[in-house]
Amino acid sequence: MVLEVEDEFSSVWRQVGVALERTGLYVVDSDRDQGTYVFRYGDRAGTGGKEILMEVHLLARESNLTLLTVHRH
């Protein structure tokens, strides 16, 4: 799945970080230069007690267009 956001990378980067924190997901690592956040979630998501690492990738396509993808780390 790819989410297309009509905003510049720096703004989307901040918004994604805030959204992850507000939803209670634990950010394990982030790299703004690479455009990645790695976060973990656990049993609340129905994983049977196992924690799963997920990764959000941000890619600036144009000056005001950023693409987001999410997948297992």
Predicted regions: what they are:
Residues M1-H73:
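Ser/Thr-rich, low-complexity intrinsically disordered terminal regions
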